[in-house]
Amino acid sequence: MDHFGENFALERLDALVGGWTMEAGPAGGAPWPGEAAVTFEWLRGRAFLIERWVVPAAFDGIAVIGAGEEPDRFRRHYFDGRGEQRIYEMTLRDGVWKQWRDAPDPFPQRFTAKFNDDGETISGGWEKAADGSTWEADIDVTYRKMS
């Protein structure tokens, strides 16, 4: 089965494919030390996009991104070196990348970032609702495409 043919929104993920450096840190604060590296690559068959990250100051991880239940949504299955597993809903359209999860374990999260005009930089951040309803800035993130 050619899943890519069934969900044309998957081609939007091509904007992420490749290697990126990533700066991240507490919202409004200095980035954590060390340069993080993130790669996105298609699993053969293009039904899933595989994301891998190495973050010297934190933890490494992987995510598997595929088609969501709605035509222009994706589902991101997240796994990290701490043993965390999370499932996020995700969109990527008009230069805006969003992810969110409403699960209370440990708290709801959402991410919004924008691509710059040439698609070489993505800037945004994560928010969390530690009490389940009040959103607060959590982590600032900037991705820069490697040449």
Predicted segments, located by residue:
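Hydrophobic small-molecule pocket/channel-lining residues, especially in calycin-type beta-barrels
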Residues: 1-147
